[in-house]
Regions:
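Signature of N-terminal electron-transfer/Fe-S-associated modules in redox systems
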Residues: 1-158
Length: 158
């Protein structure tokens, strides 16, 4: 049974003309799969490899190089929150904010809240020092005003 839907396979194929080789589509393919499945299962690695005419080891090497991909043993929650831990964010309370958010969700960075709604991750720098401390939720940067605000935005209530 196929892990990848036909629509995601088609989205991957649509990238072939945009890149100089099929191998160059590895990273976008991994992103597409994780976005849809909230992880990159072993079966998906094999299917991506087949589509890109690579070995599964080549796809896995790319996946394991980047810390933001998850396998099926540790899938993402419905919303992924990156809290910046750069110096400007830490100087403006980022450490305390991170500790309070993790304490209230009963998780450590990299973990999912019990309801699998939220995954908290650490980001080295989000390039938004003027908003320090800040966070990235999916693809959008937000000021991380306080723990209540972080949790509201993370849970889609703001």
């Amino acid at each position: 049974m196929s892990v990848l839907s036909e629509s995601i396979k088609q989205r991957i194929r649509e990238h072939f003309d945009r890149y100089p080789s099929k191998q160059a589509v590895t990273l976008p393919a991994l992103h597409m799969v994780q976005e849809e499945l909230r992880c990159v299962p072993a079966g998906a690695i094999e299917e991506i490899a087949e589509l890109l005419e690579l070995s599964p080891a080549q796809v896995y090497d790319t996946m394991s190089f980047y810390g933001f991909f998850r396998d099926e043993d540790k899938p993402l929650g419905k919303r992924r929150v990156w809290i910046c831990r750069s110096l400007p964010c830490m100087l403006r309370g980022g450490d305390e904010l991170l500790a309070e958010v993790c304490d209230r969700l009963h998780i450590t960075p990299g973990g999912n809240a019990k309801n699998d709604q939220v995954t908290i991750e650490l980001a080295e720098c989000l390039g938004a020092c003027e908003m320090a401390p800040c966070m990235l939720i999916e693809d959008e940067v937000h000021p991380a005003i306080d723990a209540d605000h972080v949790l509201q935005v993370a849970e889609g209530k703001s």
